[in-house]
Curated annotation (Swiss-Prot):
The keyword NAD does not apply. It is found in: Cell inner membrane. The keyword GTP-binding does not apply. It comes from Helicobacter acinonychis (strain Sheeba). The chain crosses the membrane at residues 21-41, 62-82, 106-126, 136-156, 190-210, 218-238, 252-272. One of its GO terms (biological process) is lipoprotein biosynthetic process. This is Phosphatidylglycerol--prolipoprotein diacylglyceryl transferase.
Length: 283
């Protein structure tokens, strides 16, 4: 065992406390993710106004819609897909966003689904642009290029919060023995960091490549969707399946199945973009 393997034994997921309210590193990481995504988008608007012909005040309004859609979709998606007591929440809807436990202690809102957040994001984006759908693909492209680096911090937050842990490392995996993290006396892959790299850094590079080589609105969000789906599908082989769900046909996890649906949605957006989007004008 090396020092990295046992890092959780020396790390507190709580960053600090404000009275009875405990502030977790995950919450701080999520806040960083939002800030990074926001300012990354503003930078893209400033640097490439032909691809992103959006006024800052309009983007600020849209960003609020998008973030609200993500949070609502992520939480509701978790309840519908992953929560074993979903029937309780469906009959006590106000409890879905209740940050306090039965004793009145602040515990925050726990349980978010990325794919649920994606659905909420798409719905919010459509509602915001419903009167001018020509701008929809521009906004989606803007989020596609600004989201991945923020996503890195989200997964780092999962790691710091000691959740969404990886699968048990095989004893004959030399690399796994080096990078694994001890969780409940088992050496597991740091799947959160693997996801941060694959679904964040690699997907960001994919979208940046597409930005350089494509001239049609809507293609960046397609590249993001396909790239994320592929990277998530791979990363799931290192992530422990949700205990309440397990695996399905062909030993696929729920994350992998939802990623396949994400491919279908991305191809649908591609079809829409090729039929309805205009070429980006050159200088």
């Amino acid at each position: 065992m090396n020092a990295w393997n046992t890092i959780y034994e020396r790390f507190n997921p709580i960053a600090f406390s404000l009275g009875s309210i405990e502030v977790h590193w995950y919450g701080l990481a999520y806040a960083c993710a939002i800030v990074i995504a926001f300012y990354m988008a503003l930078r893209m608007i400033q640097k490439d106004p032909k691809r992103f012909p959006v006024a800052r005040k309009d983007f600020e309004s849209y960003f609020l819609w998008a973030e609200l859609g993500i949070v609502l979709g992520a939480r509701i998606g978790y309840i519908l897909i992953y929560e074993p007591n979903s029937s309780y929440y469906l009959t006590h809807f106000w409890q879905i966003f209740n940050p306090f436990d039965s004793h009145g202690n602040f515990i925050g809102i726990r349980g978010m689904s990325y794919h649920g957040g994606l659905v909420g994001f798409l719905i919010a984006s459509y509602l915001y642009n419903r009167k001018d759908l020509k701008k929809l693909l521009i906004y989606l492209d803007l989020i596609a290029i600004s989201l991945p680096l923020g996503y890195v911090f989200g997964r780092i937050g999962n790691f710091l919060n000691q959740e969404l842990v990886g699968r048990i490392v095989p004893k004959d995996s030399h690399l796994g023995q080096m990078i694994g993290i001890v969780v409940d006396h088992e050496l597991r892959y740091p799947s959160q960091l693997i996801e941060a790299f694959l679904e964040g850094v690699i997907v960001f590079l994919m979208v940046m490549w597409a930005k350089k080589h494509t001239k049609t609105h809507g293609l960046l969000i397609v590249v993001y969707g396909l790239g994320y789906s592929l990277m998530r599908f791979i990363a799931e082989f290192y992530r422990e399946p949700d205990s309440q769900l397990g695996v399905y046909f062909l030993n696929l996890s729920m994350g992998q199945i939802l990623s396949l649906f994400m491919v279908i949605v991305s191809l649908g957006i591609l079809l829409y973009a090729t039929k309805n989007s205009k070429k980006i004008k050159e200088n």
